[in-house]
């Protein structure tokens, strides 16, 4: 049983092991693990693909756009005429990759778009709906679907992984990503703009600010900093963030800091003062007041 994927490509569906890339069959599903140097890989006429980068980096190139990917990120690519992964320095990548064939994708869309009665009357129906997934790299730690990919990747290093059913794993991931991104589209509609395309582009930039906050929560984060990384003006960022998330960036940052601080306090390894300092609260009185405002109890209530 394979638990070390160094310099190989393993497909959980076929149990195939190779040392070189190969063209994927349009009619097949794949759940692949690879930990190998890879300079490039062209995927022409591609199926829906979900890629989680545990380690490594590179760039996905379509005809009309390019997207950089990095460690602990995942991305969903919609069916299209194809794209190419490029890694000029051929640095090793550690990747979990799930490919959903057209038939399974249509079955999934049928399940999501029809009533229970319709599914009982026609249990094997299919619906051909254009995939709507955001083709943007997302931090795995910040989304339920990303955390699921992390768990599957971790489990794939254990011998018991080979007892799992790859189709069920793929269906689980597809459902989770659909729920996350459906929720994302609902949030995008809160952006004050007339055109859906403008709402979506603004939301994509807000996601950059959102992930930046989560990745740097132990550091001071200014509105100017968020505006710079998201390529939104301060006013546009402030207004759109408030409409989408129901609070200003500053309020969101403080709530997240306090939530993380609560976790540290419950672990019992640091004093309340040390935890407050860790998250940038220099005045323990201010920290305790904000903490009680959010949770209704002082920090000491959560000490073991």
Indicate residue ranges for each PLM-predicted region.
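Hydrophobic recognition helices of helix-based DNA-binding modules
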Residues: 108, 173-181, 241, 265
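N-terminal presequences and immediately downstream first alpha-helices
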Residues: 1-11
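An amphipathic alpha-helical interaction segment
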Residues: 126-196, 201-204, 208
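N-terminal regulatory/effector-sensing and dimerization cores
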Residues: 2, 18-127, 154-164
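Alpha-helical structural elements of signaling/regulatory helical domains
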Residues: 140, 158-161, 215-218, 267-271
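Hydrophobic residues in alpha-helical segments
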Residues: 156-159, 177, 213, 253, ...
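Basic/polar phosphate-binding segments, predominantly the helix-turn-helix DNA-binding elements
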Residues: 179-184, 190-200, 208, 212-258, ...
């Amino acid at each position: 049983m394979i638990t070390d994927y160094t310099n190989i490509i393993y497909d959980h569906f076929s149990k195939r092991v190779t040392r070189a890339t190969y063209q994927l069959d349009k009619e097949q599903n794949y759940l692949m693990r690879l930990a190998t140097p890879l300079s490039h890989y062209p995927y022409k006429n591609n199926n829906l693909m979900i890629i989680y980068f545990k380690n490594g980096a590179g760039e996905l190139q379509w005809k009309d756009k390019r997207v950089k990917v990095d460690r602990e990120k995942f991305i969903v690519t919609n069916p299209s005429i194809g794209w190419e992964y490029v890694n000029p320095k051929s640095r090793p990548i550690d990747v979990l990759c799930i490919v959903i064939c057209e038939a399974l994708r249509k079955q999934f869309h049928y399940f999501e778009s029809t009533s229970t009665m319709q599914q009982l009357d026609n249990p094997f129906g299919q619906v051909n709906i254009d995939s709507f997934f955001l083709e943007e790299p997302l931090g795995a730690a910040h989304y339920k679907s990303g955390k699921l990919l992390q768990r599957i990747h971790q489990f794939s290093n254990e011998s018991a992984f080979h007892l799992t059913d790859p189709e069920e794993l793929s269906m689980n991931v597809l459902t989770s990503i659909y729920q996350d991104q459906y929720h994302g589209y609902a949030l995008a509609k809160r952006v004050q703009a007339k055109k859906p395309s403008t709402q979506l582009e603004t939301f994509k930039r807000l996601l950059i600010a959102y992930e930046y906050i989560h990745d740097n929560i132990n550091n001071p984060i200014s509105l100017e900093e968020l505006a710079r990384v998201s390529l939104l003006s301060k006013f546009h960022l402030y207004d759109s963030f408030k409409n989408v998330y129901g609070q200003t960036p500053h309020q969101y940052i403080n709530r997240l800091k306090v939530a993380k601080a609560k976790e540290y306090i419950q672990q019992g390894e640091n004093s309340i003062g040390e935890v407050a300092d860790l998250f940038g609260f220099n005045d323990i009185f201010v920290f305790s007041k904000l903490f009680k405002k959010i949770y209704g109890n002082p920090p000491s209530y959560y000490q073991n």
